[in-house]
A protein has these predicted regions:
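Charged DNA-binding/catalytic regions of mobile-element recombinases
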Residues: 1-187
C-alpha cells in the first residue's frame, strides 16, 4: 500500500531486555462477542518484565487503536524514547501514521517476517493466555461492554497479581520493583 513500509527485525526472536522500557512487543487480536461482533485489543508488552505497559480496546482495527495502545504505554512509562517496538506486518503497524507516531516518541519500529507467529511469540502467547483465562469455556463475550469490563479487570490483575514464570513467579509490577532496587544498588 502507498505510504506503508515494513521495518527491519531488530529483535530476532530474542524477547528479552536488560532493563525495563527498552524493548516492547505488540499485536492486535480480536475478541469475539455474541451476534458476530468483534472487539479488538492492541497491546504493548515490555520484554524485560512481561508487563502490559499499554493497551487499547475498541470495536475497530484502525491505526488509532495501535496509536492509543502506544500512547497508553507512553503515559505509564513517562517516556519511550530509545525503545524498540516489535510487531507483525499488519497494515496498522506499517502505516505512515503509526510510523510517524513512533518517531515522535523516539521509538524504533521492528517487524518480524511475514507468516510466522514465532517472530512475535511473546505477543501471541500473551493473547492466547488472555483469551484462555478470560473466556474460559465460553467461545464469545456476551456483549462489547462485558468484553471491555472483563479484559480491563484481567489486564489490571495481570500486572499486579498474576504470577509469571518469567518473573520468578511474581507479578510483572513486583518483578520490576524488585529488580529496579537491585539495579540501583549495583549502580
Amino acid at each position: 500500500k502507498p505510504g506503508h513500509r515494513v521495518m527491519p527485525d531488530l529483535v530476532g526472536r530474542k524477547f528479552t531486555a536488560n532493563e525495563p522500557n527498552r524493548v516492547y512487543v505488540g499485536e492486535v487480536t480480536y475478541l469475539p462477542c455474541k451476534g458476530g461482533k468483534n472487539m479488538y485489543l492492541a497491546t504493548v508488552i515490555d520484554t524485560y518484565s512481561r508487563k502490559l505497559a499499554g493497551y487499547a480496546l475498541a470495536d475497530h482495527m484502525r491505526v488509532s487503536l495501535v496509536v492509543d495502545a502506544l500512547a497508553h504505554a507512553h503515559g505509564v512509562r513517562g517516556s519511550l524514547d530509545g525503545a524498540v517496538f516489535h510487531s507483525d506486518h499488519g497494515s496498522v503497524y506499517t502505516s505512515q501514521a503509526f510510523r510517524s507516531y513512533c518517531s515522535s516518541l523516539g521509538v524504533r519500529q521492528s517487524m518480524g517476517a511475514v507468516g510466522t507467529s514465532a517472530d512475535n511469540a511473546l505477543a501471541e502467547s500473551f493473547n492466547a493466555t488472555l483469551k484462555r483465562e478470560v473466556l474460559r469455556d465460553r467461545k464469545v463475550f456476551d456483549n462489547p461492554i462485558a468484553c471491555r469490563q472483563e479484559v480491563f479487570r484481567w489486564c489490571m490483575r495481570y500486572n499486579t497479581r498474576r504470577r509469571h514464570s518469567w518473573c520468578n513467579l511474581v507479578a510483572p509490577d513486583d518483578f520490576e520493583a524488585l529488580t529496579s532496587a537491585t539495579l540501583t544498588k549495583a549502580a
